[in-house]
């Protein structure tokens, strides 16, 4: 990963919360920055002793000014997302063997704040609620195609919370072939039809 990331220093007492795994950094938690960061930019967090705490996406328009993505120095690209999706998928397969429709990625629960990925048989639907994830949408779609190999990838981003990140509502096909309806099997015995258009 490049070492030229903008550095944000958090106030004394805030570091312990981040070290414990809390994924959000509020504006009131930030003491200073090495330079003014750009909205959507990947930044690094340090404590007042210059101890590295992790990296995350910055957005000045949100009360959550940084959404952490890792406590290590990483490069956020399609390979990064593929690795996280594989890890999340492994957990689901372990707890739901044989399931073909389920939530693959559950935002903070899978260390991907602002991203939800649902799998409906061979169709994948993603929902993005943060600017940083929105700017990496192409990387996310590429990772989804690599790991899940779906027939189609859709976005359903009409959620109200996007406005707090300065994002407009949007939905539609991102990759693959158009699909209007999907027959979904839940709990192996229950069938459900999901409308995508």
Describe every region a protein language model picked out.
Residues 1-121, 178-181:
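Non-catalytic accessory regions of SAM-dependent methyltransferases
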Residues 42-43, 123-125, 151-153:
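Structural motif
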Residues 57, 129, 158:
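Surface loops and adjacent helix of pleckstrin homology
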Residues 77-84, 132, 136-140:
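Short amphipathic alpha-helical segments
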Residues 107-118, 136-190, 194:
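Non-catalytic substrate-recognition/targeting regions of SAM-dependent transferases
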Residues 121-134:
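A short interface-forming secondary-structure element
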């Amino acid at each position: 990963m490049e070492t030229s990331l903008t550095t944000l220093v958090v106030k004394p007492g805030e570091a312990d919360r981040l070290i414990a795994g809390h994924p959000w950094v509020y504006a009131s938690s930030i003491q200073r920055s090495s330079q003014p960061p750009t909205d959507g930019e990947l930044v690094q967090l340090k404590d007042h002793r210059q101890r590295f705490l992790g990296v995350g996406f910055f957005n000045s328009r949100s009360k959550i000014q940084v959404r952490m993505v890792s406590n290590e120095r990483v490069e956020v690209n399609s390979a990064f997302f593929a690795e996280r999706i594989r890890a999340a998928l492994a957990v689901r397969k372990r707890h739901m063997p044989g399931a073909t429709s389920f939530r693959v990625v559950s935002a903070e629960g899978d260390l991907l704040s602002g991203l939800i990925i649902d799998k409906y048989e061979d169709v994948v639907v993603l929902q993005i609620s943060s600017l940083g994830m929105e700017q990496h949408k192409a990387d996310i779609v590429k990772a989804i195609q690599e790991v899940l190999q779906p027939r189609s990838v859709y976005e359903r981003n009409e959620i109200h919370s996007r406005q707090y990140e300065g994002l407009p509502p949007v939905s539609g096909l991102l990759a693959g072939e158009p699909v209007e309806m999907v027959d979904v099997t839940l709990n192996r015995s229950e069938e459900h039809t999901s409308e995508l258009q």
